Each structure stands twice: as structure tokens, then as C-alpha cells.
A protein has these predicted regions:
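Acidic, Ser/Thr/Pro-enriched low-complexity segments and adjacent helix/loop capping patches
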Residues: 1-288
Length: 288
């Protein structure tokens, strides 16, 4: 980020900041001879804390809010998108994300609850008039129970994926959620932290075997007698043929992390091999 200077009492902000703030009035929340913290006035929830990720790790932030039983919203501005985690008495109860792959429709698709054409149709049907979830329920594509389970999976994925970021900025506001927005997650915040850290480490190990989500899983013909039922279903999907590992992750319905783990185990045992995706020759002259 380029340096900012106050010239004749005027501070010129970067265009990106101006687009975010708009014409809302600002107030100085904190200042010293080394920093100046400005806050938009008249918004819901007061700013309690702000800083840069990297100087403060995600795990330390989440542990702090959990230890001191904080309630509010932690907004993280990251490379490629934003995430907001909502706390109630120190526990994460909801989360939102602007990352496309963490949208509820993509979560439902990733869990194998609908296909791409149905998802696109539901998005057009919703078209700003209603939420995508309500549109899918109204169309009979999913049940309320399906949507609740997918939303819980979505929130946990948003949290788990947050641990992969080492840079960005954060701000914590004392914004409260409405009661009907509060989710009961499958694990408390401390367990989410431990699981998130574990997944970052283990996913890197699994990907060493899988190599790429664009690679094609192929059955080798070897079928051990001691495969559990989940591994057998995974192998059956591979035997029927999938375009690539990414499609296998979606069709398994087990979620990305667990599917990568199972696929990695099948590769390690020689049951599945990964082949490079074939290259496609494009005819013609570039630019035509």
C-alpha cells in the first residue's frame, strides 16, 4: 500500500477505500504520533479492535475472543475476498464469505445435493427477490433439514479455510446476530481452532499424493479385502469414471477434506492412481 500524506489538512484516501466508505462521515477512533484509526459513524456496532493479520495470527485472534467470551463480528479482509465470523459469548455461531467457493449454493453442490444446472436455475429464480436457500426449498430441490446441514458445513468450511491466510487485515465490531441467525455448530470454537490447524497441515500431505485437483483418478484393479464401506463407495465412483479429482470431491458428498483424505489413502495403497489431465490442442491463430 502506498504512503498517505496529509496536505493542508486534507487526507486523500485510495480509491478502493473511498469505494468502500462512500460518503459516510468518519470519526477518529484512536490516534498517536504513529497511527490514525478512522471509523465510519452511525453504523451498527462499535469498533473494538483492528489490525493486520500476520502480526497477529488467526489462531491467536480466535483464541482471544473465545477466552474472554466476546460477542460480536470479526471481519477479515483477505486476498481474493472477505470473511466475517460472528461470536456469541466466545463461541462462533455464524460466518459469511465473499469467496465464490464458500457460497451456500457451491456448498450444496460440493456435498452432492444438487447439480450445476439446477443450481444455476435456482439462482435465476431467486434473482435478488429471495435467498438462494429459500428458492431451493420452494422448488423442492432441498429440504429445510438439507439446507441447515449445508449451512453448518458452509460456516465450518469458512472458518477452516481462514487458517490458510497469513496476510490481510481484521476488525472486530460488537455487532450482535438475531437469534434466528445463530447456528449450533458441531464443535466449539477451541475445537474449530484445533481442527482448522490440523486440516491445514494434513491437506498439504494429502495433496502431495493427489498432486492436482485437475488430475484424473483411475482404478488400478487392485481391491483389498479390508476396505471399509466409505472407501468402497469412493472406489466405485472412480471405477465408474470421473472427469477429475475435483468432480470426485463433489460427487462423493463427503466434503473436500474427508474426500481428499480417503483418496490419498486409496492412492497410498495402490488402489487408485492419478493421471495427468490430457492437454487439449486449440486450432487457429491466437487472437482470431
Amino acid at each position: 500500500m502506498s504512503d498517505l500524506k496529509i496536505t493542508k489538512g486534507t487526507l486523500n484516501l485510495p480509491s478502493a477505500a473511498v469505494r468502500l466508505i462512500g460518503d459516510h462521515p468518519l470519526q477518529i477512533t484512536a490516534s498517536s504520533n504513529r497511527h490514525l484509526l478512522l471509523e465510519v459513524t452511525g453504523q451498527k456496532g462499535d469498533l473494538q479492535m483492528a489490525g493486520r493479520l500476520g502480526d497477529i495470527a488467526i489462531v491467536d485472534l480466535l483464541s482471544f475472543f473465545n477466552m474472554f467470551r466476546k460477542s460480536g463480528a470479526l471481519h477479515c479482509a483477505l486476498s481474493g475476498g472477505d470473511k466475517t465470523l460472528f461470536f456469541q459469548n466466545g463461541e462462533i455461531v455464524f460466518a459469511t464469505s465473499t469467496f465464490a467457493e464458500e457460497e451456500i449454493g457451491e456448498t450444496l453442490y460440493g456435498l452432492g445435493m444438487l447439480d450445476r444446472e439446477v443450481l444455476q436455475g435456482a439462482r435465476q429464480f431467486a434473482s435478488g427477490v429471495m435467498t438462494l436457500g429459500k428458492a431451493l426449498i420452494d422448488q423442492g430441490v432441498v429440504t429445510s433439514k438439507d439446507l441447515w446441514a449445508a449451512t453448518r458445513s458452509q460456516v465450518e468450511t469458512i472458518v477452516f479455510n481462514l487458517f490458510a491466510f497469513q496476510e490481510g487485515s481484521f476488525a472486530f465490531f460488537d455487532t450482535r446476530l438475531e437469534e434466528d441467525q445463530v447456528l449450533s455448530l458441531s464443535m466449539n470454537t477451541q475445537n474449530l481452532i484445533m481442527e482448522g490447524l490440523r486440516r491445514v497441515d494434513e491437506r498439504a500431505v494429502y495433496m502431495q499424493k493427489v498432486k492436482s485437483l485437475d488430475a484424473i483418478p483411475v482404478a488400478t484393479g487392485k481391491v483389498p479385502n479390508d476396505l471399509d464401506s466409505t472407501s468402497q463407495r469412493m472406489l466405485a465412483l472412480v471405477q465408474r469414471g470421473v472427469a477429475d479429482a475435483r468432480e470426485l470431491l463433489r460427487r462423493s458428498g463427503a466434503g473436500e477434506f474427508d474426500t481428499l483424505r480417503l483418496l490419498s489413502q486409496l492412492i497410498e495403497r495402490g488402489v487408485v492412481a492419478m493421471e495427468e489431465a490430457p492437454t487439449v490442442k486449440v486450432e487457429g491463430v491466437l487472437g482470431e
